[in-house]
């Protein structure tokens, strides 16, 4: 493990993936890290599927995806991994839904999405898969909400989101799915909405205070954080084009309001397109793009108790556009872009947890 500042944290470096990729789909199942599809050096979606055995630290090639795709969503359902949507080799959104059967090492096709979509957000609850939003073949953002019933192998429609979007951040908290941000074409969305799984109704919460693309979002201790990103030009700032910011905005779920933290509590680095998550009592920001000519390797954490940012151990491999996944005490940064698509697989860990 690499060590440095932030004594509670360290990096665990795993063997590189056999295939370099960006926009890969990742899942963690029974001690195995699965990396599916994505884009390789040629810039085209892959059908390659690989898994890392966390015990032996060895990679194994899996049966290829029936549909080559990048930017798909994945949900673990027991011994299966369901892959939903994405973009295909023709740069068109995908309707295909496929399941990898881990015990049998093979893929099965499942009921397709009612409408092809990329940038779908997925959430699993009680064995059901909820797919929210996306962008269709006509490039219009979608408001559809669908739920997949594995036993019947079918998708059912639920009340649509108030705000169509794709690429949104989603969080499951209690009996509600929270949907934050996303995009409509090139424009970032500021909407923050919640779907009640029992009442099957939507609630609009106050919108994000600022409009930013490629921000990082996380939930920790009853609050939702929106960090950094590319600030969009607007009537209330003097920038004529998007610029990197270190903004920190926090929504208190109990009180139902946003707080834009003061300058003294902003992130140490301005960044966008980075990995974000919650480890222990810290909200963590990893890598990304900033004002430098190459991806950032810096890492920082916001201590929820001390309410301040501190430097954490830097990434062993500086990258942006990583696929990320949180599994127990590890926050993975997988693939992404260094000087091109990367093979790196690294995890920021809580020292006491590994």
Curated annotation (Swiss-Prot):
GO CC, any one term: cellularization cleavage furrow
Keyword check for Chaperone: no
GO biological process, one term: mitotic nuclear division
Annotated localization: Cytoplasm; Midbody
SMART domains per UniProt: Kelch
Chief location bin: cytoplasm
InterPro entries linked to this entry: Kelch-typ_b-propeller, Kelch_1, Kelch_domain_containing_8
Per-repeat ranges for Kelch: 1-31, 32-79, 81-127, 128-175, 176-222, 224-281, 282-329, 331-354
Keywords, ordered alphabetically: Cell cycle, Cell division, Cytoplasm, Kelch repeat, Repeat
Keyword ATP-binding included in the entry's annotation: no
Disulfide bridge partners, by residue number: none
Its biological purpose: Involved in pinching off the separated nuclei at the cleavage furrow and in cytokinesis. Required for mitotic integrity and maintenance of chromosomal stability. Protects cells against mitotic errors, centrosomal amplification, micronucleus formation and aneuploidy. Plays a key role of midbody function involving abscission of the daughter cells during cytokinesis and appropriate chromosomal and nuclear segregation into the daughter cells.
The protein's name: Kelch domain-containing protein 8B
Organism for this UniProt entry: Bos taurus
Gene it is expressed from: KLHDC8B
